[in-house]
Amino acid sequence: LLLSSALLLGCLSACNTSPRESKVMEANDGSVTTIESNGNKLTVCDLSAVKDTIEVPLSEFVEDCRIVRFETSEEAYFKAWFINATDKHIGIRQGNQDVFKLFDRDGKFLYNVGSVGSGPGEYDTTLYDECIDEKNGHIFFTPFVGKRIMMYDINGQWIKDIPLPMQINKAKIWVNEDGSLSVVHMPFEEGEPLAFRVDTEGNILNQIPATAATKVMNFDGEVFSYRNCGDFDFFHTGID
C-alpha cells in the first residue's frame, strides 16, 4: 500500500509541470500514512502494520437475529436481488424482471405482487425499489426507469399507477407519516428534481432541484437506501 501511495504521488507530480509542495505525515504506529500534495490529501492504511486493535461484538450493531426458513413450494422459489424485511412481512425483489414475492416473517409464501407484462398492474422493466406500507396496507414499486409509481394493496392486488410529470431513473421510495411518498433518483438535467415528495394522485408537493454537481451523465451510478435507521437514508454513488 505504501508503495502504491508513492507511485500515486509520483503520477500526480508527473501530470502537472507546475511547482507542487508535498509532504508525508505518518501515524505514531506507522499504520496510517497521509500524503498531502498541493492541498489535497490521500490517506492510506497499511493493515499489516496495525498493532492496536479492538474487538467489536455484533450486538453493538444488531438488536435481534433469527434464521428464517422459507417455504419450499415451487411458487415460493426465488432468486433474491434485494430483501425488504418489515414488522410483519418479508418482500423479495428479484432481478431479470421476475415477479416480486411476499412472505410472512416465518417464511410462509403469501402472494406474488403484480406480475410481469405490459398490462394493468404489470411491470415490463426491472423493479428498482419497493416500500411496504403496513400501516395503510399498501405496497409501492418504482421501476428501473419510467414515469409512474405502482401501487398495490398488502394482498398483492393492483390498485393503480401513480402518474409522474417527469421520468424517474433508479428511484428509491419512502412512505411518510401523512401517506405521501418521498422519492430520490438520478436526474440527468440541471433543474430536474433530485428528490421530491408526491401524493398518491401524482401531485408534486415539494422538490429539491438538481444542480450541476448533483446531476448524472449516465446510468453507471446507483442509489442505495437500506432503511435501517428509522428514516429515509440514502447513498447516491453519483454524487456522494
Predicted regions and their residues:
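Sec-dependent bacterial lipoprotein signal peptides
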Residues: L1-S13
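Eukaryotic scaffold repeat domains enriched in small/polar residues
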Residues: C15-D240
